[in-house]
C-alpha cells in the first residue's frame, strides 16, 4: 500500500521536528510516507457554508492526487485531518458541492470522495498495531505519567471523522502505553485549547490552556502529548505551567 502524505503548513515550518520524526518512524514501522508532489494549505478551518467552494479546492486537489497514487492519504496534523476528511465527506455525499467543485477544477475524472483519509494514529492502530509498535520501541518511556490531549478537531464530528469514540477515546492512551509510559485520564482532554482565539483574545486562551493543564496535573499527569501541532503550540506558549 502507498501511504501518500500531506504534511500541511505547520509541520513544514513550526513543527518540522514532528514531521521528521513521523517520517522516520514510518520507515522503521514499514509504511514509508510518500509526500504529495504538490500540495497547498488545506485552509486550516473547515468551511461551514455549502457555497464556499473556493475554500474546498486545495483539499480536493490533495485528495485527487492521492486517488491517482493508490487512494490513501495520511496526515499528522489534526487540523489538516479535520478539514480534508470533512471535505472528502462533502464530495462523497453532497451532490451540489461535488458538482460545483468538479465544474471548477475541470478534472478528467470527476472526484467523488474515493480517497481514504487517515490520521497517522489510525495507521499505527489499524495497520501496524500497538503490539508491533511496542516491540520496536528502543527507549521505553518508563515511569512517566502522560496525559493525552485530544482537543476538539481530531474526533468531532464523530459521524464524519469516525476515528474514535468522541466522549471516551482510547487511541492516544494506547499509543502512550505502547511507548512504555502510563496514560493518565483527565476530564478536559477533549476540551478546546482556544485554537486561533490566541490571536484575538489571548487572555481567554490562556485561561482555557491553564484549566486544561491544571486538570491534567491534578490527575497525576507529568506531561501532555497531543496529535495537533497547533494545540501543541497553544499548550506550550499559553497558560500556567499547571
Per-segment meaning from a language model:
Residues 1-242:
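Iron-sulfur cluster-binding electron-transfer modules in prokaryotic oxidoreductases
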Amino acid at each position: 500500500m502507498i501511504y501518500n502524505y500531506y504534511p500541511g503548513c505547520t509541520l513544514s515550518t513550526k513543527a518540522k521536528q514532528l514531521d521528521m520524526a513521523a517520517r522516520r518512524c514510518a520507515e522503521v514501522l514499514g509504511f514509508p510516507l510518500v509526500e504529495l508532489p504538490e500540495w497547498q494549505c488545506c485552509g486550516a478551518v473547515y468551511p461551514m457554508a455549502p457555497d464556499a467552494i473556493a475554500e474546498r479546492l486545495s483539499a480536493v486537489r490533495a485528495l485527487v492526487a492521492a486517488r491517482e497514487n493508490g487512494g490513501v492519504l495520511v496526515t499528522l496534523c489534526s487540523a489538516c485531518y479535520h478539514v480534508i476528511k470533512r471535505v472528502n465527506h462533502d464530495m462523497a455525499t453532497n451532490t451540489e458541492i461535488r458538482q460545483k467543485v468538479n465544474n471548477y477544477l475541470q478534472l478528467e475524472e470527476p472526484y467523488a470522495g474515493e480517497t481514504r483519509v487517515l490520521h497517522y494514529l489510525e495507521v499505527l492502530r489499524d495497520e501496524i498495531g500497538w503490539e508491533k509498535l511496542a516491540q520496536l520501541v528502543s527507549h521505553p518511556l518508563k515511569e512517566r505519567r502522560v496525559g493525552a490531549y485530544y482537543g476538539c478537531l481530531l474526533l468531532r464530528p464523530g459521524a464524519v471523522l469516525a476515528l474514535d469514540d468522541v466522549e471516551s477515546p482510547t487511541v492516544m492512551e494506547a499509543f502512550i502505553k505502547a511507548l512504555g509510559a502510563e496514560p493518565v485520564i483527565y476530564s478536559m482532554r477533549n476540551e478546546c485549547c482556544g485554537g486561533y482565539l490566541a490571536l484575538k483574545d489571548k487572555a481567554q486562551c490562556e485561561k482555557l490552556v491553564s484549566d486544561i493543564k491544571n486538570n491534567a496535573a491534578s490527575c497525576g499527569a507529568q506531561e501532555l502529548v497531543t496529535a495537533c501541532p497547533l494545540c501543541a503550540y497553544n499548550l506550550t506558549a499559553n497558560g500556567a505551567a499547571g
